[in-house]
Amino acid sequence: MLSKEKINRINELSAKAKNGQLTDEEAKERTALRKEYLDTFRATMRDTIENVKVVDAEGNDVTPEKVRQAKKNKFLN
């Protein structure tokens, strides 16, 4: 999870960019922070999806095959 300070900094830089007052150095910092945020988000989402088990009303496991394979590959690596 990204720290509160980094998220606040992303928001500060975005607000500054809306006003057109962003320096080249700040634009690079914003790009790096956004990339870090998206990488963290994607990893968390992937982990969440890989740990989901879908069950129908009758109690049968109907988890999509792609998710099952991802889960299996995760434990093999």
Curated annotation (Swiss-Prot):
Keywords: Cytoplasm. One of its GO terms (cellular component) is cytoplasm. Transmembrane segments: none annotated. It is found in: Cytoplasm. Pfam families: DUF896 (PF05979). HAMAP family: UPF0291. Belongs to the UPF0291 family. This is UPF0291 protein Bsph_1689.
